[in-house]
C-alpha cells in the first residue's frame, strides 16, 4: 500500500447524490442520509440554532 498522491487517483466513485427533499448534492449513497436536510435519518428538516446569525 502506498499513501499520498498515487492513492488519490483511485477515488472515482461518487459519494453524494442529489437529495429528493432539499435538492442539494449531499445525499450519501452508502448511508442513504442527507447531510444537509437530514432526509433518511429524521422526518423533520435538519436545522440548528448555531446555523442562524445571532441578533443583539
From Swiss-Prot:
Residues noted as binding Zn(2+) in the record, renumbered to the chain: 19, 22, 34, 37
Single Gene Ontology MF annotation: rRNA binding
Record keywords, A-Z: Metal-binding, Ribonucleoprotein, Ribosomal protein, RNA-binding, rRNA-binding, Zinc, Zinc-finger
Bound cofactor: record note: Binds 1 zinc ion per subunit.
GO cellular component: a single term: cytosolic large ribosomal subunit
Gene3D superfamilies membership: 2.20.25.30
HAMAP family: Ribosomal_eL37 (MF_00547)
Similarity comment: family membership: Belongs to the eukaryotic ribosomal protein eL37 family.
Function of the molecule: Binds to the 23S rRNA.
Protein name: Large ribosomal subunit protein eL37
Amino acid at each position: 500500500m502506498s499513501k499520498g498522491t498515487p492513492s488519490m487517483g483511485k477515488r472515482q466513485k461518487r459519494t453524494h447524490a442529489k437529495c429528493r427533499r432539499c435538492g442539494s448534492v449531499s445525499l450519501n449513497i452508502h448511508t442513504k442520509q442527507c447531510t444537509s436536510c437530514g432526509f433518511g435519518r429524521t422526518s423533520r428538516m435538519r436545522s440548528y440554532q448555531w446555523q442562524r446569525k445571532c441578533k443583539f
